[in-house]
């Protein structure tokens, strides 16, 4: 990066800089396209899975909410997913037991648990971060 940038000011090598920059742009676009396809594949895979695992008519609504907020507090889920509270709590329990959700911070006293959808986060990070 710096050598190409220096070559612009030192040698007037705008062609080299533009080539470098556009190559990086293409590489990043390919990476982002792969991530988008991986996320879509994960959604399709988990859509069928969650319906079976939870046996709930609200399973897809819960999955959509989790995909939109892959790190969340259990109380935020229960309060905002717009499904009955007992069902929301049961869905969280099932998803934790099945390993779809991981505890980033366990519940303690009045503090709710902080949960993460690690598969989605790992795709977006491009590594096993969670």
Segments (PLM) and residue ranges:
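Phosphate/pyrophosphate-binding active-site loops
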Residues: 1-37
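Short acidic (Asp/Glu) and glycine-rich catalytic loops that position anionic groups and cofactors
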Residues: 1-4, 39-45, 70-71
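Short alpha-helical segments that sit at the start of domains
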Residues: 33-63
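Short, cationic-aromatic polyanion-contact patches
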Residues: 55-56, 103-129
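Short acidic, hydrophobic short linear motifs in intrinsically disordered regions
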Residues: 63, 68-81
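Basic amphipathic alpha-helical segments that dock to polyanions
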Residues: 66, 88-101, 115
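Short hinge/loop at the helix->beta-strand junction immediately C-terminal to the helix-turn-helix recognition helix
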Residues: 71, 100-103
């Amino acid at each position: 990066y710096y050598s190409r940038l220096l070559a612009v000011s030192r040698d007037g090598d705008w062609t080299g800089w533009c080539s470098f920059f556009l190559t990086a742009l293409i590489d990043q676009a390919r990476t982002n396209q792969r991530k988008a396809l991986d996320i879509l594949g994960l959604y399709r895979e988990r859509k069928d899975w969650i319906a079976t695992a939870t046996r709930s008519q609200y399973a897809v609504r819960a999955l959509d909410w989790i995909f939109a907020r892959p790190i969340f507090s259990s109380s935020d889920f229960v309060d905002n997913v717009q499904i009955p509270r007992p069902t929301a709590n049961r869905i969280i329990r099932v998803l934790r037991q099945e390993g779809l959700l991981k505890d980033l911070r366990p519940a303690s006293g009045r503090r709710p648990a902080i949960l993460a959808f690690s598969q989605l986060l790992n795709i977006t990070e491009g590594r096993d971060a969670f």
